[in-house]
Amino acid sequence: MLFIFDRPGRYAFWMKGMKFPLDFIWISGDKITEITGKVGIDQMNLRPQQPVDKILEVNSSWAAEHQIKIGDTVKYESVSN
C-alpha cells in the first residue's frame, strides 16, 4: 500500500491489527531514503529518520528480495477507478 502525503513529515506508523510483518519503504520526492525491514506485528510508532512524503508498505523481505536500496529512484503511475 502506498501512502502519499501533501507535505513531507516524520509520520508515525504502527502495526495495530496486522497479522503479518511488513517492510516499510520511506520515500522523499522520487528517492528511497530509508527501508525498515521485517516490521513485526507488535511494533508501534515507527517513524523515518528524516521527513518523507510517501511511505510504501510491502510484504516482509520484499525489499531485500527485489534488491531495493536507499537512493533508488521510485516511479509510479496513478490508477483510476
Protein language model regions, located:
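Compact, glycine-rich, soluble single-domain proteins
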Residues: M1-N81
